[in-house]
Amino acid sequence: GSSGLIAFPRL
C-alpha cells in the first residue's frame, strides 16, 4: 500500500 507498486502493494 505504501510503495504503490503492483508487485508489492502491501509494502
UniProtKB/Swiss-Prot annotation:
- Which BP terms from GO are recorded? neuropeptide signaling pathway
Q: Which family does it belong to?
A: Belongs to the periviscerokinin family.
Q: State the function annotated in the UniProt record.
A: Mediates visceral muscle contractile activity (myotropic activity).
* Origin: domain of life: Eukaryota
Q: Where in the cell is it found?
A: Secreted
User: Keyword Secreted: yes or no?
Assistant: yes
**What name is this protein filed under?**
Periviscerokinin-2
Which Pfam family is one of those matched by this entry? Periviscerokin
Q: Which UniProt keywords apply?
A: Amidation, Neuropeptide, Secreted
The answer to keyword Cell wall biogenesis/degradation applying to this record is no
Main localization of the protein?
A: secreted
What cystine linkages occur within this chain?
none
GO CC, sorted alphabetically, is: extracellular region
Give all Leucine amide modified positions.
11
